[in-house]
């Protein structure tokens, strides 16, 4: 078997609430826009990564996913995020921290999703 990419889905009560985290903070772009459709959704894209974001109150209330984004320069990412969007820093991991498993990590979140930013040695 060969796969090209994994494209996860995240559900929001109000899809526009996702834009602060995805477009403003993480600098994803909307690759496909159906935000005005009856069953609103969009595809966020950046650096070969894609995520489907859906407006669905029922699923948004049931699911709170966590993802990891791996970088080679966590200090630069942290510096930018903490300067521009400090309110998105996760209270349990709001500084770059060396974890017992060897990765440096910090986390950001909104009301619907959490991203752990990682750098491996």
Describe every region a protein language model picked out:
Residues 13-15, 67-114:
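Vicinal oxygen chelate
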Residues 51-54, 107, 115-118:
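Conserved beta-strand in the GNAT
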Residues 56, 93-99, 119-121:
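Acetyl-CoA-dependent GNAT
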Residues 36-40, 61, 99-104:
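Short acidic/glycine-enriched loop/turn segments that link adjacent beta-strands
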Residues 1-4, 59-64, 100:
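Short glycine-enriched loop/turn motifs at secondary-structure junctions
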Residues 47-51, 58-60, 74-77:
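Short, charged/polar surface micro-motifs in flexible loops or helix N-caps
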Residues 1-19, 67, 121:
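N-terminal beta-strand motif that seeds the catalytic metal site of vicinal oxygen chelate
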Residues 10-50:
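Core segments of cupin and vicinal oxygen chelate
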């Amino acid at each position: 078997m060969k796969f090209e990419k994994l494209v996860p889905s995240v559900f929001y009560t109000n899809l526009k609430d996702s834009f602060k985290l995805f477009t403003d903070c993480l600098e994803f772009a909307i690759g496909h826009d159906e935000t005005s459709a009856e069953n609103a959704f969009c595809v966020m894209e950046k650096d070969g990564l894609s995520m489907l974001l859906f407006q669905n109150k029922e699923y948004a209330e049931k699911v709170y996913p966590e993802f990891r984004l791996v970088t080679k320069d966590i200090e630069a990412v942290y510096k930018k995020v903490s300067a521009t969007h400090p309110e998105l820093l996760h209270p349990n991991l709001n500084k770059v921290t060396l974890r017992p498993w060897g990765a440096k990590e910090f986390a950001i979140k909104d009301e619907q999703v959490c991203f752990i930013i990682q750098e491996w040695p």
